[in-house]
Amino acid sequence: DPPWDVLQYGSRGAVQHYGLLTPSQIRDLPLADLCAENAHCWLWVTNGTLRIGYDILESWGFTPRSIFTWVKPRVGLGTYLRNTTEHCLLGTRGKAPVRFKSQPSWGFFPVQPPHSHKPEEFYDIVERVSPGPYLELFARRPRHGWAAWGDEIASDVVIPGFPVPKYSDALIKDFHKKAEGA
């Protein structure tokens, strides 16, 4: 789940919880070097980053194949509409097989995890559909059988030039906006 620095200026948005990355910074992640030649990539996007997500997935060398929609039990934030969904794009590279082809393209999980955390059931879906090995970028907690990378967890991999910056463009703009009003 990339920390998108897109439309994050509200008092309850992602900028209040963690450092953010611009779409260019996310695109610059060396995902091609971290994945096998035959691989699946599941990329979480918000409603506001859906189009950008497709571009980034393709820039990493993956062909978009499907979209999984998480229907949330509570009404969330939104710039235009109050979002109750989040999406995960599924892309493939090479000839990675699909292990389970009857997976519905949506899920409703009755317990909504804390801000930006994804439901545990989603990891089960990934393991059912995609062959391993598994790597979660921007991970928050370890999962058995998965490698992890993120600034909130002991990472299994190193990505030169990263971790997530502590001060994103949105946070800096918000700081200046508040300073001008003071």
Regions found by a protein language model. Name each.
Residues 2-182:
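Class I S-adenosyl-L-methionine-dependent methyltransferase catalytic core
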